[in-house]
Amino acid sequence: MNYTQTLEFLFSSLPVFEAKGATAYKPGLERITAFCRHIGNPQRNFFTIHVAGTNGKGSVSHIIASVLQQAGYRTGLFTSPHLQDFRERIRVDGEMIPKQKVVNFVDKHHGKMVELELSFFEMTAALAFDYFAQSDVEVAVIETGLGGRLDATNIIVPLVSVIT
């Protein structure tokens, strides 16, 4: 698959909340937990700051990531939704995930994604965790999706939680 084909798979084969609304949301942490176990639990390889709340999550997440980066930490940032480019969601030290990393991850794991019926958000979170671990991130700032106790990002064990 190339990058365009990969995005077509992601947006057409996995339930996307922005396109399908509540029908894309499947409560529970079982799928993301099983998938992250399948890929080696990468979310355990770095410290996390978990950002939740009604408004301002993205702005606060970007500010925290910028401060950490300026302080010399190798920093991951996971936010949603993206505005123009899917890769905006996943950054290391301010740089978007390379297209080829997205393609390689989906090529390698798409069978398991389909088998577990991962949502688009669950897959995106797992991709971020995997990329952060591969990139030797020291601290990752993780923005919740829909929030609540069953949000896919709740498989992390945060060093700090922030509510906006």
What is each stretch, according to the model?
Residues A22-L29, A34-R44, Q70-I156:
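ATP-dependent carboxylate-amine ligase catalytic core
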